[in-house]
From Swiss-Prot:
Basic and acidic residues composition-biased segments: 42-60
Residues that bind Zn(2+) 1: C158, C161, C215, C218
Location of the protein in the cell: Cytoplasm
Residues noted as binding Zn(2+) 2 in the record, renumbered to the chain: C175, C178, C201, C204
Organism: Haloarcula marismortui (strain ATCC 43049 / DSM 3752 / JCM 8966 / VKM B-1809)
Region (Disordered) location: 29-60, 73-131, 160-191
Name of this protein: Chaperone protein DnaJ
NCBIfam families: DnaJ_bact, PRK10767.1
Gene Ontology MF term list: ATP binding; heat shock protein binding; unfolded protein binding; zinc ion binding
Length: 384
């Protein structure tokens, strides 16, 4: 048996939307798969997200409270999850998003045989679609955190008609197709019996009302494409491909419903000096042959400034040094990963006579066989 949504978020049944949102944020911080060590974190995160989506939607919450948890879950399965859309691309319209999920009124009617809430279909408050876009940042910004300006073109409610799709005071009439209900009903005879299906009225598009003129600005759509400039807070430690959510910055809702959210996929640019692996960083540092033989103190760059590293005598090319705590910050957690510095002994491409003579004497005095040293990843693994 699945858990009650109020219990999942730890709120009372009369909790306000703000209280539910705050409870969800706390659960998200605790159980987000990127930050939690709990083996069941992903499932708990999904449960909290589902609970928030239902309890912050006025219509869904009303149905949930009326039906109870188990019957609501059954009705949802029976109704299915309608809609859905692809991801937005980098060219053209940068946004994508789902159609906003299932119609709870239809599910309620199917489950109880049409005894749901009356009124026109167009009067229901619906949350707007979530929108998706991308934002590129530097590795330094991922390390330190940053405030970025994001310019987007997104659908917004038309100011001229206040999102209604028709001018104020336009003459109207009840839609004769659906008799003002916003939905039409079709009955089909199947081997299992008669099946009743309700669909949005095509003639009035679910409004239940026909108007003699449409808004010239939005052409009756109720929304227009506008440019918006948003400030995005980039948390330190964010990784390439992770998504930030800006609540209520998505597409406008219908009939006074809340806006959807804006989902921002973060893309971290490659860095010339560092390669990232989770919370760890890798850096290759060139040293000279004498430094490798006799040892030296070298200066190594980090994302937090330069540090000095002692290279012991006899260091081999490809050897890895671990600088604890010099890697990436752990997202929404304390501490940093490590920086792994792989030294590469540089072979000189030109020698003067004195250098050649010294090396020849060195070679004659040696006589030892040289083994091929283990690779970078083997050294990295063995250093852990």
């Amino acid at each position: 048996m699945s858990q009650d949504f109020y219990e999942i978020l730890g709120v009372s049944r009369d909790a306000s939307e703000d209280e539910i949102q705050e409870a969800y944020r706390e659960k998200a911080r605790e159980y987000h798969p990127d930050v939690s060590d709990d083996p069941d974190a992903e499932e708990k995160f999904k449960q909290a997200k589902k609970a928030k989506e239902v309890l912050t939607d006025e219509e869904k919450r009303q149905m949930y409270d009326q039906m109870g948890h188990e019957r609501f879950e059954q009705a949802e399965k029976r109704g299915g999850a309608g809609g859905g859309g692809g991801r937005g691309g980098m060219g053209g319209d940068p946004f994508g998003g789902g159609a906003g999920g299932f119609d709870m009124q239809d599910i309620f009617d199917q489950f109880f045989g049409g005894g749901g809430r009356g009124g026109r279909g167009g009067s229901r408050r619906r949350q707007g679609q979530d929108l998706q876009t991308r934002l590129e940042i530097d590795l330094e910004e991922a390390y330190n955190g940053a405030t970025k300006q994001l310019n987007v073109t997104r659908p917004e409610a038309c100011d001229d008609c206040d999102g209604a799709g028709h001018p104020p005071g336009a003459d109207s009439e009840t839609c004769p197709e659906c008799n003002g209900q916003g939905q039409t009903t079709q009955v089909q005879q199947t081997p299992m019996g008669r099946v009743q299906q309700r669909t949005t009225c095509r003639r009035c598009d679910g409004e239940g009302t026909l108007y003699d003129e449409t808004c010239s600005t939005c052409r009756g759509n109720g929304v227009v494409q506008n440019d918006a400039s948003l400030e995005v807070e980039i948390p330190s430690g964010i990784a390439d491909g992770q998504t930030l959510r800006m609540e209520r910055e998505g597409a406008p809702g219908e009939n006074g419903g809340p806006n959807g959210d804006l989902l921002i996929e973060v893309q971290v640019r490659d860095h010339p000096d560092f390669e990232r692996d989770g919370d760890s960083l890798q850096h290759q540092q060139a040293i000279s042959f004498p430094q490798a033989v006799f040892g030296d103190t070298i200066t190594v760059p980090t994302l937090d400034g330069e540090v000095e590293v002692d290279v012991p005598s006899g260091t081999q090319s490809g050897e890895v040094f671990r600088l604890e705590g010099k890697g990436m910050p752990r997202l929404r957690r304390r501490g940093h990963g490590d920086l792994y510095v792989q030294v590469q002994v540089v072979t000189p491409d030109s020698l003067n006579a004195e250098q050649k003579e010294a090396l020849e004497q060195f070679a004659e005095a040696g006589g030892e066989e040289v083994d091929v040293d283990e690779g970078f990843f083997e050294k990295l693994k063995n250093s852990l």
